[in-house]
């Protein structure tokens, strides 16, 4: 081989390696499948936990007034018949929501009986949850409006729940993506399943990735050390939850690269009950593509019950 030609070939190889960057490590398919199956097991375990989404049986939005709570049908907030006819009153005041317990009725906070307690909301440093027999309730605050969320730790829906339906595991939906940061992280308005209510998380930038030879982009928000994606795709019409799905990704390295794994995408809590306030996919986060990976939707795994304004 001509010496000059050999040097030219070597130079081209070096330039190609530098231009392409480090090669992606080959995916161990068996280990990857085991990872996804472990993730699915953890997902179901969290759903079935006492304070998971499946024990939620009621959501009641509150104005500044007094509400009676109990199993008596005449109560402002009616709970299952396993509870006392009149548990007490929720008094919504400028300083918060006070629970005043009916005399002779046992309500516990951290295992200790209480007769009156200020119900600090879930947005506070020390939120309060109280229990009565199999029931528990707490106050949630969503950018101003407040509600009482009720759980039943003996809810029969939990016993009959499952299994969660999934698409087959497909490594093609585990993609390398890139975060293109905004000049400054920005607050974005995100609609929720509650009409008129929005959330206002922080978005660091736009994530771009490629699927089936086409480039797409999503706007994630910051969730602790991770990026949180609320996305929609063409499967929302028939096989996945209509309002979209969730997926998390580890924050990118200094090069802005991250792994976005749609095999770990899952249905939001509102796919399982009517008592959640989850965000829905924004128009910019709806992808014109069928992402046939991750969790699917099954109508029989949704509990409606009652939710009152």
What function would you assign to each model-found segment?
Residues 1-9:
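Bacterial N-terminal signal peptides that target proteins for export
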Residues 16-19:
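C-terminal motif of bacterial Sec signal peptides marking the signal peptidase cleavage site
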Residues 21-23:
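Bacterial signal peptide processing site
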Residues 56, 61-127:
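Forkhead-associated
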Residues 111-126, 215-264:
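An exposed acidic His-Trp-rich patch
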Residues 131-199:
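Surface-exposed beta-loop interaction hotspot
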Residues 163-166, 234-238, 251, 257-259, ...:
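Extended, aromatic/histidine-rich regions of cofactor-dependent oxidoreductases associated
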